[in-house]
Amino acid sequence: MKNILSRFFPIIPAAALLALSVFQPSCANTTQAPTGGAKDTLPPVIRRVVPAPGTASVPVHGTKVVFTFDEYVTVKDPKGIFLSPPQKKSPKYKIKGKSLVVYFEEDLLPNTTYTLDLTGAIADNNEGNMFPGFTTAFTTGETVDSMFVTGIVQDCNNLRPIKGATVMLYKDQSDSAVFLRRPVAAVKTDDWGYFSLRNIQDTVFRVYAIVDGNGNNIYDPDEDRIAFLDTLFRPVNVVNDTVAELRKYDMKDTLACQSRKAELRLNVFREKPSKQLLMNKVRTGA
């Protein structure tokens, strides 16, 4: 009998320990929030563009450009969606799934190369990681223009770079062109006042830059500041994938941004307003 009891009772402590181990999680600390995994710090990546970069014979009417990303995105700054040559009305857009659809309210010009730039416009939908930018080129003619020019726009008083200035090219060499019509090619400067104006014609241009107060891509002396190149300019560099100046840079990378080559330097100033006054009134006829 004793042997039977000694063999039976040692089971009880083991069973008790098993019960404690089963019910112990119910006493765990529940105040710690779940981590949810690592924070997403990567910007969106473009997977597809339609029409593809370099497409020719694009229709002048009803054209839209679709950028498809690897994740859901949002438009942070609509002004960052910039068409060159600019139209009277800015491009419109809508988000459709993981795609950004850009369309134009005006017909495109015939036999014209266009660039559509997204610098500073797009971020991912969850963490707000900014898309570094992308420029696509297409043409309504047979061949995409292939030249480019780089430069810096700065304040003439302190030589500080000017962000968001509009650099404009005109084939019309008259002084009045910048007052009356939009340019044949244009681009916005980045945070460092730097610009790379790509897919332009191999021809002679007048070069201007304006701080465009009302965003109409025409120089308004009462509102805008202006810079200009005092000589005619003809581009000498050809677009290709290996050109460092055509890449999109992280604006926080000071060394890389300041190391970019700049062909032109444009110093912005404000013109003094001039008013025509009637100094004297004389009656000369009967």
For each feature predicted by the language model, list its residue ranges.
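Acidic, low-complexity Ser/Thr/Gly/Pro-rich repeat segments typical of extracellular/periplasmic
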Residues: 3-11, 26-192, 196-199, 204-210, ...
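Bacterial N-terminal signal peptides
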Residues: 12-25
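Acidic carboxylate motifs that coordinate Ca2+ or other divalent cations, activating on Asp/Glu
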Residues: 216
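An amphipathic, aromatic/His-enriched active-site/gating alpha helix that lines ligand/cofactor pockets
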Residues: 219
